[in-house]
UniProtKB/Swiss-Prot annotation:
UniProt-recorded name of the protein: Inner membrane assembly complex subunit 17
Gene: ina17
Gene Ontology CC annotation, any one: INA complex
GO aspect biological process, one term: mitochondrial proton-transporting ATP synthase complex assembly
Bilayer topology term: Single-pass membrane protein
Keywords, alphabetical: Chaperone, Membrane, Mitochondrion, Mitochondrion inner membrane, Transit peptide, Transmembrane, Transmembrane helix
Main location class: mitochondrion
Length: 112
């Protein structure tokens, strides 16, 4: 035979606590103007400051990227100018060398 265990479900129920109501009468403290200023304006000023900082840093990052790409383009153009001048100088040297070679060949071998 099974015996029933004594279980007290009253422990597990939620107790109702009476709600205390605030009384809006002359006993309530006066809030200082200093605190009221921050209560009224802290959130809007914070939002404006946050948006201003986000905009500033976002535009600064964009400027850094654009400046870096501009500097890279300037370096590439300078490098291209140097390469072209080098190739022109080497071409002139080669042609001068060939002309000199042809002249000396003509001097030593007039039959050609």
């Amino acid at each position: 035979m099974l015996r029933k265990l004594p279980i007290n479900f009253a422990k597990w129920t939620v107790k109702k606590v009476p709600v205390q109501q605030k009384r809006f009468n002359s006993q309530q403290k006066e809030i200082s103007p200093h605190i009221m200023f921050y209560k009224n304006y802290a959130r809007p000023l914070g939002k404006v400051t946050l948006f201003a900082l986000a905009t500033y840093y976002g535009l600064e990052i964009v400027w850094w990227k654009l400046d870096a790409s501009e500097q890279e383009a300037i370096k590439n153009s300078k490098l291209l100018i140097c390469e072209s001048s080098f190739s022109l100088l080497t071409f002139r040297r080669i042609t001068e060398f060939r002309e000199c070679e042809i002249k000396t060949r003509d001097l030593y071998d007039p039959e050609i």
